[in-house]
Amino acid sequence: MQASSAAAAAACSAIKPAAHQHTVQVQEDKRGSEFRARFGTRKLSWGGKLSVENSALHQCQSLTRSIRRQKRQHSPVLQVRCYAIAGDQHESIATEFEEICKEVPQKLGAFYRFCRPHTIFGTIIGITSVSLLPMRSLDDFTMKALWGFLEALSSSLCMNIYVVGLNQLYDIQIDKVNKPSLPLASGEFSVATGAVLVLTSLIMSIAIGIRSKSAPLLCALFISFFLGSAYSVDAPLLRWKRNAFLAASCILFVRAVLVQLAFFAHMQQHVLKRPLAPTKSVVFATLFMCCFSSVIALFKDIPDIDGDRHFGVESLSVRLGPERVYWLCINILLTAYGAAILAGASSTNLCQMIITVFGHGLLAFALWQRAQHCDVENKAWITSFYMFIWKLFYAEYFLIPFVQ
């Protein structure tokens, strides 16, 4: 009996700690449930004070793995979309580049026509030829002489662009009839673009002239500016191109007098620092170019007779008729070539005499031969003949240095 009581007591004592431990476990589970309910955590399989922290870390890792799975699932789609966007951008850039490649040559071609290239070539050849006249020996060909020549040439080219550009700005309606291929008349350049080009050319020309500190060069530039503006600008007492005499006088004075005397003085007096003493070559060039410039001034109006007549420009071609003006120009040139042959024959240098006599004789013969097949009523033919006269103009400057 006593043994039974002792066994029962031992069992009770063993059950009490187990019950107590169970009670503690239940309380911890309850507190853990409340904590998880409050903070959204999940109880792990083990207890302890780090269970909450470990549970939160586990959730973060689970979220990271979930995001990675979503990325892996959507990455092919994203890559396809990125490739599509990149492809569209590449095609857009390629299209823009092709458009630019097409537009740049067109704009350059329009600018080339805007500058009136036959006048540009005349300026380059004329100034180059006249700048060589003061040179007496190879010792004169220095870097200073080259720099002075480049100052004269660059400023003159800019002034040339100003003059021809200003004329186009004021002749847009006339050029739509006479010269529809010009960029302002055809619409390739806007009026604003033309104005910017004209103003920029003027500023550059004057700036180069001022920087050179050459009185002859500045004089030539300012006179060219005044005469070029008076020729084209439609204002009271201006627009001299309406009058045949004033129009011819503007072209003659610039092409014949200014180019020969001013640029000769610039090279001899300002660059080479020598006293101004005109030579036989520069006197001959001035007189001969007076004839040639008069012909250019008269002949250029023959192809433009329709537009000039329509807009009230009283050119000599409008007043006398194109055929009479045509033969007047031919006779003036032939007379000038005859005088040039006599001037060349008076040279004491045999080589120079041969070059000037035969050179001018050959040019006169070419002019006469082509003039016999005239078709004044054909605008394309008369325009082509006008360009031929400019070629004779260029050729003359190659002969002028041999007239000594």
From Swiss-Prot:
Annotated Pfam families: UbiA
Pathway: Cofactor biosynthesis; tocopherol biosynthesis
InterPro entries found in the cross-reference section: AtHST-like, UbiA_prenyltransferase, UbiA_sf
Transmembrane portions of the chain: 114-134, 146-166, 190-210, 217-237, 244-264, 282-302, 325-345, 348-368, 380-400
EC number(s) from the headed UniProt entry: 2.5.1.116
Stored PROSITE patterns: LIPOYL (PS00189)
Catalyzed reactions: homogentisate + (2E,6E,10E)-geranylgeranyl diphosphate + H(+) = 6-geranylgeranyl-2-methylbenzene-1,4-diol + CO2 + diphosphate
Main location: plastid
Transit peptide extent on chain: 1-81
Topology relative to the membrane: Multi-pass membrane protein
Cell location: Plastid, Chloroplast membrane
Top-rank EC class of the record's enzyme: transferase
Family membership: Belongs to the UbiA prenyltransferase family.
Note: Seeds of most monocots are enriched in tocotrienols and contain only small amounts of tocopherols.
Annotated protein name in UniProt: Homogentisate geranylgeranyltransferase, chloroplastic
Naturally occurring in which organism (per UniProt): Oryza sativa subsp. japonica
